[in-house]
Amino acid sequence: MRVSALLLVTLRDDPAEAEIPSHKLLLRGGYIRRVASGIYAYLPLMWRVLRKVSAIVRQEMDAAGALETLLPQLQPAELWQRSGRWSGYTAGEGIMFHLQDRQDRELGLGPTHEEVITALAADLLRSYRQLPVNLYQIQTKFRDEIRPRFGLMRGREFIMKDAYSFHASAEDLGRGYAAMDQAYRRIFSRCGLQVVAVQADSGAIGGSASQEFMVTAEAGEDLILSSADGSYAANQERAESLPAEPVPLQSATAAELDTPGQTSIDALVEAQGWHASQLVKVILLVARFEQGRQQPLLVSLRGDQQLNEVTLANWLNQQHGQAWGALLGIEPLEAKHLAAEKVPAFGYLGPDLSDAVLQGSKKLESSFLRLADPTALDLPLFICGANRFNAHRLAANWSEPGMASPQRVELRAALPGDRCCHDPSQQLQARRGIEVGHIFQLGLKYSEALGATFANEQGQDAPLWMGCYGIGVSRLAQAAVEQHHDSAGMVWPVPIAPFEVVIVIASSKEAQQVELAEDLYGQLQQAGVDVLLDDRNERAGVKFKDAELIGIPWRLVVGRGAVNGQVELVERCSGEKQEGPHQDLMAQLLQTLDQQRQGL
């Protein structure tokens, strides 16, 4: 490929819309262009990267015995209604684009394909002799993200590989899950990525177990918590830990203290000299359910802890989903929904806040669902808001008159510095990560809902055991840039680089340089190398900057030494340069490329 035919349009300055390095570089390097919020065009360079990533994914999935297929993007609402996910994905903050056709039939534009594949399995899989089977596809998915950001990281349209396996038993599902785990590790390794496998929450997909694969990068949206010995790692949403022991509140007489302007834990600690673990903070939320219920929540946490909203959402679904329908979302309870004259600033609220404050809203239930984390409930004495402006209570306790009894629910989030459960002598360490893969053991969730059964060895009908396995192909490509870049531009790993080598002609006006460059270009093509020839009539400095920006792993510079058959070989990742006879450097380059393609 010649640059003159490539449609290479690079930018010198960072686009205003881009926040993280990989997004800036992909836009500047002419890999992608924004069409609308969360919607991007993949330009020729990017498409070459995506094809290479997809090829590696296909090779490993095929080697693992999976069968490629292609499922419809338009999905009937009826399937999602049978699984119980239609309302959750379309109402409120649901992420599914949905529409009605000419016959007023409801359809969804697939964000995922569990329902469709399970319906097909119900039709196609009749006997244990057909099991196990694993079907996968690489396809564009659609999600109506509330806040699209970071380019391809969180878009409304993206390329994904999703696979679905069906098994005769839980044990066989476990074996299939383990096989996919190993296939995923090979995929990410071959793509040149440093990935951490972590325990994860199953979220809206569901199931009994799941694991995420995280590319470690400072711009990652997820917080990974892990032990120093490497034996434990989890997404913060799923992580478990032992909380720090609280600093005891010395015996004191119950009293109210003036705390003007001290509406946060940090402000109270600084002004009063208290320790955060001596305080109980109150968080007011509203949980919205499928059947229309809007349930106010009063959550009490120890002052040094944070709420894990994923844990809270899971608990609400488990405890109340059957009676109230699926949980649609959890939002902060706004002051405008309360009886304003009875409610102080939220920083002064205590666990005994009266239900009477809810009289200001006709939409909300008339009483709080009161929940408290054990770290708060186990405090014999604590400091909390006095439910009036500029005041806190000292030496409050849960057994005193007027203190409502909340339900005891594990709601705290694991935090960096917490003690590890498996070894309290170790502390959890934090790093940022970008999720590029997620595997699930779904169990019987979808097969039972959609009637997907098979005849087992005893001739009896039994539900299929199911797993699902996703890789964000377009997200993986951007994550590679986030992990491999420098101040000059991208640094693509060889296996997924759009081109492996770029030949730069220092002066297109020099016939000897052009002749040698053309000769090397032909040799590399014959050797099966993905090579790009920069044949533009531009200054050498412009060509060098573009070559570094777009991140081609190797650069051959044909300059003044061409008269003697001399060229310069530059490795993008290290910046190391070598000059010598073109025959010697070409032989060295081909040998090195062969090793790099294999991840060596």
From Swiss-Prot:
| Gene3D superfamilies linked to this entry | Anticodon-binding domain, Bira Bifunctional Protein, Domain 2
Please name the SUPFAM superfamilies in this protein's record. Class II aaRS ABD-related, Class II aaRS and biotin synthetases, YbaK/ProRS associated domain
Q: Which reaction does it catalyse?
A: tRNA(Pro) + L-proline + ATP = L-prolyl-tRNA(Pro) + AMP + diphosphate
PANTHER family with a match to the protein in the record: MITOCHONDRIAL RIBOSOME PROTEIN L39/PROLYL-TRNA LIGASE FAMILY MEMBER, PROLINE--TRNA LIGASE
Q: Which CDD domains match?
A: ProRS-INS, ProRS_anticodon_short, ProRS_core_prok
What is the protein's major site of localization? cytoplasm
Q: Which family does it belong to?
A: Belongs to the class-II aminoacyl-tRNA synthetase family. ProS type 1 subfamily.
E.C. number: 6.1.1.15
* Subunit structure and binding partners: Homodimer.
Organism, as annotated? Synechococcus sp. (strain RCC307)
Question: Where is the protein localized?
Answer: Cytoplasm
Q: Give the top-level enzyme category.
A: ligase
* Protein's name according to its UniProt entry: Proline--tRNA ligase
Per the record, the gene is proS
Domain remark from Swiss-Prot or TrEMBL: Consists of three domains: the N-terminal catalytic domain, the editing domain and the C-terminal anticodon-binding domain.
Q: Where are the transmembrane segments?
A: none
Q: Which HAMAP family match?
A: Pro_tRNA_synth_type1 (MF_01569)
Q: What does this protein do?
A: Catalyzes the attachment of proline to tRNA(Pro) in a two-step reaction: proline is first activated by ATP to form Pro-AMP and then transferred to the acceptor end of tRNA(Pro). As ProRS can inadvertently accommodate and process non-cognate amino acids such as alanine and cysteine, to avoid such errors it has two additional distinct editing activities against alanine. One activity is designated as 'pretransfer' editing and involves the tRNA(Pro)-independent hydrolysis of activated Ala-AMP.
Q: Which UniProt keywords apply?
A: Aminoacyl-tRNA synthetase, ATP-binding, Cytoplasm, Ligase, Nucleotide-binding, Protein biosynthesis
MF terms from GO for this chain are: aminoacyl-tRNA deacylase activity; ATP binding; proline-tRNA ligase activity
